[in-house]
Amino acid sequence: MAQPAAIIRIKNLRLRTFIGIKEEEINNRQDIVINVTIHYPADKARTSEDINDALNYRTVTKNIIQHVENNRFSLLEKLTQDVLDIAREHHWVTYAEVEIDKLHALRYADSVSMTLSWQR
């Protein structure tokens, strides 16, 4: 009988990037918070101590950081899709979800967030 999927959660990854369409947003980095959920069958990793038997969340996180910090985005939707594409790129991934909060985007609100998901 197959085991339920393992779930990796990258919580509150705080980064700064260029996001938005207003001049101030184009010229100044803004704080964002990224949350990623990844499901994968960890059958080998459950009984192993070999990193090659597990989905390496450090590699995923480093790829997200590199992409977000080295690019500019007009739309939160595009940024969220790009991060989702990174989260789901390993062939073991069966489900991925990304939520990105753009902090202080609206007056009187802590943030505005966008959530996108993908399933194999």
Curated annotation (Swiss-Prot):
The EC number(s) this enzyme carries: 5.1.99.7
GO molecular function terms attached to this record: dihydroneopterin aldolase activity; dihydroneopterin triphosphate 2'-epimerase activity; identical protein binding
Keyword Cell division: no
Intrachain disulfide bonds: none
Keyword Isomerase: yes
EC top class, as a word: isomerase
Coiled coil region boundaries: none
Inactivation phenotype: Cells lacking this gene show no detectable growth defect on complete and minimal medium. The folX deletion selectively eliminates monapterin production and secretion, but has no effect on the intra- and extracellular folate profiles.
GO biological process: folic acid-containing compound metabolic process; pteridine-containing compound biosynthetic process
GO cellular component, as recorded: cytoplasm; cytosol
UniProt xrefs under InterPro entries: Dihydroneopterin_aldolase, FolB_dom, GTP-CH-I_C/QueF
Record key words, sorted: Isomerase
Record field: catalytic activity: 7,8-dihydroneopterin 3'-triphosphate = 7,8-dihydromonapterin 3'-triphosphate
Pfam families, alphabetized: FolB
Stated role: Catalyzes the epimerization of carbon 2' of the side chain of 7,8-dihydroneopterin triphosphate (H2NTP) to form 7,8-dihydromonapterin triphosphate (H2MTP). Is required for tetrahydromonapterin biosynthesis, a major pterin in E.coli.
Family: Belongs to the DHNA family.
Subunit-structure text: Homooctamer.
Protein name as annotated: Dihydroneopterin triphosphate 2'-epimerase
Organism whose genome encodes this protein: Escherichia coli (strain K12)
